[in-house]
């Protein structure tokens, strides 16, 4: 990981760690770098594209289930910065896996397509973010139950 700043290194490390299955880090790192090479064909600065894609998917608010007097409410709340990035990466990778199952193509191509869609504010992960924000705005009347 050449001349990246701390935040960019952390993003790449999270990408690798979230995708890793059975501790096969070198295999996953190769997939991530192949995805970056595909992205480099379309855009000059791959890391900036990745950071922008994650920023476009980051949720601002989320809902938490809270039980009050025997009733369960979806209570909206603000998401911490680290959790925003974690959720965004998790959603992008989940959408790539979903594409892989649907279309039967390689994981590099699916990741490439989903990252580009996230950068362009489209795709499965962006839709998931919009659904979460819609749920939070629908349940904003229960915000007074937020005491954690």
UniProtKB/Swiss-Prot annotation:
The answer to whether keyword Mitochondrion applies is yes
| Main subcellular localisation | mitochondrion
Q: Where in the cell is it found?
A: Mitochondrion
Keyword flag Nucleotide-binding: no
Known InterPro entries for this protein?
A: Ribosomal_uS7 (IPR000235), Ribosomal_uS7_bac/org-type (IPR005717), Ribosomal_uS7_dom (IPR023798), Ribosomal_uS7_dom_sf (IPR036823), RPS7_plant (IPR034643)
Q: Which interval of the chain is the signal sequence?
A: none
Keyword field: Mitochondrion, Ribonucleoprotein, Ribosomal protein, RNA-binding, rRNA-binding
One Pfam family matching this protein: Ribosomal_S7
Q: Which GO terms describe its cellular component?
A: mitochondrial small ribosomal subunit
Give the Gene Ontology MF terms in alphabetical order: rRNA binding; structural constituent of ribosome
An individual GO BP term: translation
What the entry lists under CDD domains is as follows: uS7_plant (cd15484)
How it assembles, according to the record, is: Part of the small ribosomal subunit.
What is the role of this chain? One of the primary rRNA binding proteins, it binds directly to 18S rRNA where it nucleates assembly of the head domain of the small subunit.
Give the record's family classification.
Answer: Belongs to the universal ribosomal protein uS7 family.
UniProt name for this protein: Small ribosomal subunit protein uS7m
Name of the gene encoding the protein in the UniProt record: RPS7
